[in-house]
Amino acid sequence: RQLLQTLGCQGRTRPLALYGPAGLDAIWPALRTLTGPLPYPIRARQLDKDPVDLAAFGWPAGAQLLPIPTRHRVPSRGYALTLPRAGRFLPEKARALGVPVADWKKLQHGETVQVREWEVTPAEVLGPPRRGLKFVFSGDTAPCPALEAAAQDADLLLCDATYAEPEQEAQAKQYGHSTFGQSAALAARAGAKRLWLVHYSPMITEPEECLHFAQGAFPRAECGFDGKQLTLQFEEELHG
């Protein structure tokens, strides 16, 4: 409620798409009443198992938000955001098919174009698909196969790290959370590129002092914090 009201106070007028797990449909009318009048419309949608096509919200074609069933004391979801990347544009093929230069960008953006009496599809002028980007957020969860599968080859995984020490694994399991080491081990098994630990318990006042519990299993583990930012780059851009 406070976040929605804050967005209104900041002058937001653009529509907001709000997604949530099972149960959202039941509580949304009451929550919307509590927010009071807002200067922007909200489209609330309950997520099941199907991915959300993000193209309608201005993302590139093929971008998806996938709900992940996680393991917590109450029904919970993590989320995987995937951004595919088309193959490299092959101008020689476009020329051979008679595609005007003015239409090349349409093909690069996944659109089919009309050339005289026939259509030319992107697949006819693009190389093999290139590696895209994947961002995964665990939400509150104990380690589970669904999260590990979703985090395969992720560029960035934000993972529950409620407890720091290995001796707290039983407590973490009881309450549906993870330790620093468990999240790091999951990231390593999944082949993630980066791991940010999040959702610390109040007992962890200095997360950096506990980071060694994670870096033994996953050296690229970092402590997440409010406002931390990272620009993810495609592989060609990363390696020059």
What are these regions, as identified by a protein language model?
Residues 1-46:
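Active-site HxH/HxHxD metal-binding segment of metal-dependent hydrolases
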Residues 23, 83-86, 235:
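Short loop segments at secondary-structure junctions
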